[in-house]
Amino acid sequence: MATDTSQGELVHPKALPLIVGAQLIHADKLGEKVEDNTMPIRRAVNSTRETPPKSKLAEGVEEKPEPDVSSEESISTVEEQENETPPATSSETEQPKGQPENEEKEENKPSEETKKDEKDQSKEKEKKVKKTIPSWATLSASQLARAQKQTPMASSPRPKMDAILTEAIKACFQKSGASVVAIRKYIIHKYPSLELERRGYLLKQALKRELNRGVIKQVKGKGASGSFVVVQKSRKPPQKSRNRKNRSSAVDPEPQVKLEDILPLAFTRLCEPKEASYSLIRKYVSQYYPKLRVDIRPQLLKNALQRAVERGQLEQITGKGASGTFQLKKSGEKPLLGGSLMEYAILSAIAAMNEPKTCSTTALKKYVLENHPGTNSNYQMHLLKKTLQRCEKNGWMEQISGKGFSGTFQLCFPYYPSPGVLFPKKEPDDSKDEDEDEDEDDSSEEDSEDEEPPPKRRLQKKTPVKSPGKAAAMKQRGSKLAPKVPAAQRGKTRPLPKKAPPKAKSPAKKARPSPSVIKKPSGSSSKKPAASVRKEVKLPGKGKSTMKKSFKAKK
């Protein structure tokens, strides 16, 4: 049969479907017999079933057979067989497909596990870095306890190697200095955690470092052998040289300042926008401005805040009235708020208590170059980059955006500087101005007290009638001034009673001034006694003229 089917040219096209159909029927009969016995033969039958349609398709691509009754029957039988066989083939095909899927899953699992292990290792490395609490952080006792639990302080059970070396040299000092052998024994005995027996290079490095600094001096030997002495006078000459340098050119106090200490203040000044709640403002003002007595009189602070909002110096973001959050407004770089002591206190409180404190690296670079330029600007930028990285590792700062030396950083601990630290130039000027104002007020009051009486005296001549309050005040001053004038004029008034007895013609004239002298001190004005004195001064002249007339009459 195979030879007949293979020679397609000899077979008539109409006879081809009949031959194929006969083959299929014969195969079906064989399959029915074998189905009851074993399954493996069925697989072979399936393979034979599948081959004829392939050959049929290969041979009959060009020639399309005409449909006959026999062909229709054969097609129907093929369809029935195909409908019966799929469950077995589907299960068979699923088995080999399922195996590679399982293999792929098994391969993916180890890759995922390796990724997880890498992540865990990176997290462990991050956890291993001990986060410390910075010296500039302003924390209460409860906040400090919480922070210590969350970020345990890096305990330092022993000092640094340089300090240990100087301590050992002083302890082992003799006439010829301290030998390296004695120094080593001392350190091994007192600081066993260093393991100096195994790590002898630590001692050599420390000796070399301290020799270069000039802290110690080598008396005997060379290198890491011999005897050493601590130089005590090395600290005084540099101070003198510094003083001389400062006298000649006072420029180099900056190297002593660390960028780690500068950054928190830079963050507080550069952070924008600055805003704080009423409770924080009140807390800060009551702490640093006790003269305002905000705890006793909170209404003063509330009124000042409301007044600043009405003027446009502050913006109330949340809340109503004096409660809520207030934000500073600026014209350029200068804040609009300022002037009185209360306004200055509110300004410093909002600037200091603003949280969270964030700042961009560009603003930090500009601030450092303007305020702490150093000798080399490029080196200063390098130091700034290193300090930011170190602060981030210690957990003092956090990079919110960007990577490396770009983006924005944020302080992880609260920092509330005092007004003197926040505005060092403004506060002393304000205090001086306040003192000057007080002095001016006192001096003006004293001058007014001294200058007030003369115009009153002039008015007294013009207007004898005065209020009872002024009269009482003038009585006291009149009592002080009255005894002084007669004391100076007593020498001139005394000769009057001596020359009075020979006078006979002028009793009426002399009787007139006596009541005026008695009445004038009892009067309300202080000028009247002075006027009476003037009249008394003129009286001797009149007395002399009368005396001359009396002498002439006697002659």
Swiss-Prot record:
N6-acetyllysine: residues carrying this PTM? K190
Task: Report the residues modified as Phosphothreonine.
Answer: T51, T85
Write out the ranges of the annotated region (Disordered).
29-134, 227-254, 422-555
Q: Where, per the database record, does this protein carry N-acetylalanine?
A: A2
Carrying Phosphoserine, the residues are S6, S142, S155, S156, S248, S249, S443, S444, S448
Positions with biased composition (Basic and acidic residues) = 51-67, 100-127
Name of the protein described by the UniProt record: Heterochromatin protein 1-binding protein 3
Using the record for this protein, list the coiled-coil segments as residue ranges, or answer none. none
Compartments, as annotated in UniProt = Nucleus; Chromosome
List, alphabetically, the CDD domains matched. H15
Biased composition annotated in UniProt, kind: Acidic residues = 430-452
Query: Which SMART domains does this chain map to?
Result: H15 (SM00526)
| Comment text on domains | A central region that included the first H15 (linker histone H1/H5 globular) domain binds at the entry/exit site of the nucleosomal DNA.
* Function, as annotated: Component of heterochromatin that maintains heterochromatin integrity during G1/S progression and regulates the duration of G1 phase to critically influence cell proliferative capacity. May play a role in hypoxia-induced oncogenesis.
Q: Report biased composition (Low complexity) as residue ranges.
A: 513-532
A single cellular component GO annotation: nucleosome
User: How the protein assembles, per its UniProt entry?
Assistant: Interacts (via PxVxL motif) with CBX5.
* Pfam families, per database record: Linker_histone (PF00538)
Q: Which InterPro entries match?
A: Histone_H1/H5_H15, WH-like_DNA-bd_sf, WH_DNA-bd_sf
Annotated Gene Ontology MF terms? DNA binding; nucleosome binding
